[in-house]
Curated annotation (Swiss-Prot):
Active site positions, chain numbering: 140, 178
Listed EC numbers: 5.1.3.20
Family, as annotated: Belongs to the NAD(P)-dependent epimerase/dehydratase family. HldD subfamily.
Cofactor(s) the protein needs: NADP(+)
Ligand binding (substrate): 169, 180, 187, 201-204, 209, 272
Protein name (database record): ADP-L-glycero-D-manno-heptose-6-epimerase
Modified residues (N6-acetyllysine): 267
Protein residues bound to NADP(+): 10-11, 31-32, 38, 53, 75-79, 92, 144, 170, 178
InterPro entries attached to this UniProt entry: Epimerase_deHydtase, Heptose_epim, NAD(P)-bd_dom_sf
Record Gene3D superfamilies: NAD(P)-binding Rossmann-like Domain, UDP-galactose 4-epimerase, domain 1
Organism encoding this protein: Shigella dysenteriae serotype 1 (strain Sd197)
Cofactor binding note from Swiss-Prot or TrEMBL: Binds 1 NADP(+) per subunit.
Catalytic activity: ADP-D-glycero-beta-D-manno-heptose = ADP-L-glycero-beta-D-manno-heptose
């Protein structure tokens, strides 16, 4: 069996899909379906079982057996960069991850987990997986950074695989439940389909991020499981492309619309990553050599998926 925490969420459900595509259906999805809309991410997928996150954590802490577990993909977390309840964030992202890590280490179960580019904070260069480059801007980034630091202490002694992926700006299918935290491509598509003007912040040609397609993210996760490599790795494309490029690809697909530029909100000033670009040196050195989709390629594929029933 393979366990996917956050399996009804954005990246988790895409990992489930990638496993299904390889013929793997013996999957336990762990999630919190208090937001009932997330079930739509699983309706076209095949899994063996579902368990609530709280029940799962109780069983993990009690050391209960889940049978022959081949791996745990730990994607379950609070991923809101605007959530400032630090106790909630540390319980949910840090403490929970530690419990799961030790469960896996004791049983030598491969543990593949979601870290984040938010660990780098407001940098504009050198997004490198090393302590001197890490300075998160928000409590979400701090919770991810602290767990990475915890993993670094354990890695030299670990007898089983531990791998963390610092996801950059992931976009693609199955993110509709994320609301305001969904990608710009998702929001632009919604605005166009609602007959509204698609909106970007003023200066969006200058805001550049490493936008990585979720299908590529899932592929990297599965490659690492198959190849057994440990470590903490950036997971982006290695390219920074502008929000304007995302909009251009969206409008090109829809063949309509004109961008309306809106003022940059004061509340985000100083807490907003204006530039991200993954340094892929370590990922490539680990042996992953496949190309990543460009914004034009990924957004076009995503638009086709979003509008498949149109």
């Amino acid at each position: 069996m393979i366990i996917v925490t956050g399996g009804a969420g954005f990246i988790g459900s895409n990992i489930v899909k990638a496993l299904n595509d390889k013929g793997i259906t013996d999957i336990l999805v762990v999630d919190n379906l208090k937001d009932g809309t997330k079930f739509v991410n699983l309706v076209d997928l095949n899994i063996a079982d579902y368990m609530d996150k709280e029940d799962f954590l109780i069983q993990i802490m009690a050391g209960e057996d889940f049978g022959d577990v081949e791996a745990i993909f730990h994607e379950g977390a609070c991923s809101s960069t605007t959530e400032w309840d630090g106790k909630y964030m540390m319980d949910n992202n840090y403490q929970y991850s530690k419990e799961l890590l030790h469960y896996c280490l004791e049983r030598e179960i491969p543990f593949l987990y979601a870290s984040s580019a938010a660990t780098y904070g407001g940098r504009t260069s050198d997004f490198i997986e090393s302590r001197e480059y890490e300075k998160p801007l928000n409590v979400y980034g701090y919770s991810k950074f602290l767990f990475d630091e915890y993993v670094r202490q354990i890695l030299p002694e670990a007898n089983s695989q531990i791998v963390g992926f610092r996801y950059f700006n992931v976009y693609g299918p199955r993110e509709g439940h994320k609301g305001s935290m969904a990608s710009v491509a998702f929001h632009l598509n919604t605005q166009l389909n609602n007959g509204e003007s698609p909106k970007l912040f003023e200066g969006s040609e200058n805001f550049k991020r490493d936008f990585v397609y979720v299908g590529d993210v899932a592929d990297v996760n599965l490659w690492f499981l198959e190849n057994g490599v440990s470590g903490i790795f950036n997971l982006g494309t290695g390219r920074a492309e502008s929000f304007q490029a995302v909009a251009d690809a969206t409008l090109a697909y829809h063949k309509k619309g004109q961008i309306e530029y809106i003022p940059f909100p004061d509340k985000l000033k100083g807490r907003y990553q204006a530039f991200t670009q993954a340094d892929l040196t370590n990922l490539r050195a680990a042996g992953y050599d496949k190309p990543f989709k460009t914004v034009a390629e990924g957004v076009t594929e995503y638009m086709a998926w979003l509008n498949r029933d149109a």
